[in-house]
Amino acid sequence: MIACFIGDSRMEGLYFYGDLKEADFLYKPGATVYDIMNIKLSMNGGGSCLLTDVLSGKQYSHIYMMVGVNELGDRTPDEYAKAYSNDIETIRQLQPDAVIFIIGMMHVTTQYSNSSDVFNNDNIDARNTAAASIANGRDIFYLDMNECVDDGVGGVIGDYSYDGVHLKAEYYKLWTEWMKAHGIKNLIK
């Protein structure tokens, strides 16, 4: 395995429905930048393990991480970026040769965004901007996957989501195809 994907329930969806068979996935619904290094995550749909244990025992060439939706109401974008940066630094220490991709947090639907003071696309954009600042253009990069599910006004297309936050199963392949079209087609299958 050359690629590892890390995240919350949205990454879990990518594991189950994104058709990325040759990558490892570590995820937990509800995971945040504040706890992802200290909680047990599911690995490839199986047993649970600590992220640091997996990253200590196996080297990856590329690591993709997306978290953020669960902590939208917790702390400021700058505090979020600091915690994310600390997580990335821990990953870097355990994976010195890996290229790390921070995947920008997926928006919610416009309808969902308009109905929430916390879980809305303005808050997501503020945190995505903060997370993007961690990228260094050498071995840490930022990817904004929102364009593959965008409704034209900054939200996920309503029909693509079953709850306003998560994609329906059939739309995770759009995310996979977007990633393959943006320079990583030889890394994931």
Walk through the language-model features, giving the residues of each.
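A short helix->loop->beta-strand "cap" motif at the edges of active sites that frequently abuts
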Residues: 95-99
